[in-house]
UniProtKB/Swiss-Prot annotation:
Keyword Nucleotide-binding among record annotations: no
Cellular compartment(s): Nucleus
Originating organism: Arabidopsis thaliana (Mouse-ear cress)
GO-annotated cellular components: nucleus
GO biological process: regulation of DNA-templated transcription
Family assignment from sequence similarity: Belongs to the FHY3/FAR1 family.
Pfam name, any one: FAR1
Up-regulation conditions: Up-regulated in hypocotyls by far-red light treatment.
Designated name of the protein: Protein FAR1-RELATED SEQUENCE 11
Amino acid sequence: MSDDPGQMLLIYDDPSDQRSLSLDDASSTEESPDDNNLSLEAVHNAIPYLGQIFLTHDTAYEFYSTFAKRCGFSIRRHRTEGKDGVGKGLTRRYFVCHRAGNTPIKTLSEGKPQRNRRSSRCGCQAYLRISKLTELGSTEWRVTGFANHHNHELLEPNQVRFLPAYRSISDADKSRILMFSKTGISVQQMMRLLELEKCVEPGFLPFTEKDVRNLLQSFKKLDPEDENIDFLRMCQSIKEKDPNFKFEFTLDANDKLENIAWSYASSIQSYELFGDAVVFDTTHRLSAVEMPLGIWVGVNNYGVPCFFGCVLLRDENLRSWSWALQAFTGFMNGKAPQTILTDHNMCLKEAIAGEMPATKHALCIWMVVGKFPSWFNAGLGERYNDWKAEFYRLYHLESVEEFELGWRDMVNSFGLHTNRHINNLYASRSLWSLPYLRSHFLAGMTLTGRSKAINAFIQRFLSAQTRLAHFVEQVAVVVDFKDQATEQQTMQQNLQNISLKTGAPMESHAASVLTPFAFSKLQEQLVLAAHYASFQMDEGYLVRHHTKLDGGRKVYWVPQEGIISCSCQLFEFSGFLCRHALRVLSTGNCFQVPDRYLPLRWRRISTSFSKTFRSNAEDHGERVQLLQNLVSTLVSESAKSKERLDIATEQTSILLSRIREQPVSSLAIRDISSSVQRNF
C-alpha cells in the first residue's frame, strides 16, 4: 500500500449506520460555522477512520479539508439528513470530493442566452460521512463512512493551491486591494505589491489575479442609480473642499445621470497658459460604467503632458458632444483653444464647428495610423510596409502641391482607386496632412515622441478598477502625482547647466528666457542656421543650404517693426523660429531673438507670480487689484532704461490687441468701476 494517502483505496462503512448516498442529490444544507478547534485526534498527517470523533461537524469539515489538500483535491458539503423541525434535528452530514456528481443537462430556452461553462464534475465517489451522537447530554460527531477512491488524477502540491476552496482573500488584503484600486494601478501591480509586502515568491499568494478582479467587480455591481448619486455626491464633496473644482452634469427625463464633465483647479490654471493646443481623446470607454470617456490634455512649457479635464457621456451624438464642448469652455472661462486635435468622428467634427467656430480642428495622426493595419494590411499584403513608408513621406511634405501630386502617384502605384479608406483619408486631408496644418499652432503634438508621451499619460486614467464614484478621485490622484512629478522635473531641468553650442549672443539670450526644453528646440535651429546662406531679394530673402544651387525658403523681415516670417511656417506650427529666419536675423546683425518670437507658453514662468494669480483666481475685484499692482511695477521697471521701455511699449501694444478681442461682461465693468473708485 502506498504511503501517500491520496493514492490509497480506502473504503470504510459502519454497518450500524446504513443510509443510501446519492452524490447527484444537490439538496445540501450548510449550517453556520462553529468556533471549536480540531480534536486532539486530528493530527497533521492523520487519515480519517471509522469511529473518529469530532466535537462539531465544522471541525470534521476542517479536518477532512486539510486531509484533502494534502492528498491533492478539495471537498464540499453535499447533503444533510434529519433537518431541524423533522424530529431529532440535524443527525448526519456528507462531505464529498469537489468532482463528485455529474453536471445536469440544461434544457435550452428559446430567446435566453446560454453560458458555455465547463464543469469539473466527473462522478467521483470519494466521501466522508459523519453522524451525530448524544450521550448523557453531551453531543459529538462520529465518522460512520469514508471512501478515498478517486476516478480522476490528484493534483500536485503546487497545483492544488489553485483550487477555489483553497483560495481566499483576507479582510486585511481586501482593504489593501480596494485602497490600491483607488490609485488606478493595474491588478498585476497590486499582486506584485502584495507579494513584496508578504515576502512571498511571485504567484504564491493565497489568491489569484482572477480572484482580485472578481472582488473589484463585486464592488461595481451596484444599482446604477445609486452609482450616479454617489458619483455626484463625490463631486460635491470635492467642491466643498476645493471651491476651484468645477463640474457640470445633465439628467435625462427619468432623472438619471446622462453626462458629466469636470476639471480641477490646477488644470484650469494650466489651461490659461498652455491651452492654445489641446488633444481631446475620445477613443476610450470607462469599463466601470461602459460610458464613452473624453480626456482633454495639452503640453506645458517643459514639454510635459498636462491634464485639462474629463467628460463621461451616455451617447456619442451631436447633442452630447456639443454639451461636452460647452462645459469645457465654461470651465475655462469661455476661452476656446486655437487648435483641437481629435479622433475621426463626424458628430464631434460638427460639434466643434458649432461650438468652437474660431478653433482649428485637426486629427491626431497617431489615432489615424493606429487603424491602418485593419484598413490596409489584408488588401496590400506584402506591400503594406512599402505603402506605409510612402504615406509617411507624403505626410511630412511641406507644400500642398507636392502632396497632391504625390498622393495621386501613390494611389496609382498601389492600385487603391476604389479603396474607401483611402478615399476617406483624402477627403479629410486638410485635417491631418502637415502641408495643410503648418500654418496652425499644434505645439509639436504631432511628433512621434510627443504623441507617445501623451498617449502614455492618458493610459494612466484608464486602469480604474472600482466604482464610478471613485473614478473622479482616481483621476485627481493621477493629476496630483503628475503635477508633483512635473514640478520635480522642472526643478531638475532648471538646475542643469545649459550647454551653448554656437556662442552667439542670440543663443545665450534665448537660453535665459526659454525653458530648457524649449531652448533645446530653438538651439537645434540655431546650429543648423550656420549651414545656410541668405540672399537678399526685392521682396525679402531667399535662404537655402550652402550645398544647394536652387530652391530654398522665402523669408520676409521688417526690422523696424521686428517682424519676420518664413515660408516653411515652423514658427506658426511649433512656436520656434526656423533656421531660415534665424539665418536672416544673424545676417542683419540682430543679437537677440525678438521677444514676440519667444512665446510666453515656452518661457520660464515665475512660480511666485503663478501662485499669486491662482490664489486670487476666484475674486474678480482682487484680480483687478493684482493687475493694477503689476502695471505699476511694469511702469517703474520699464522706466529704468530706453531698451526696457521699448520692450514694454511693444509687448503692451500686442497684449492690448489680444485683450480687445475678448468678450466683455457687464459684471466685470461694474467690478472694474468700483475698484477704480476705491483706489483713486
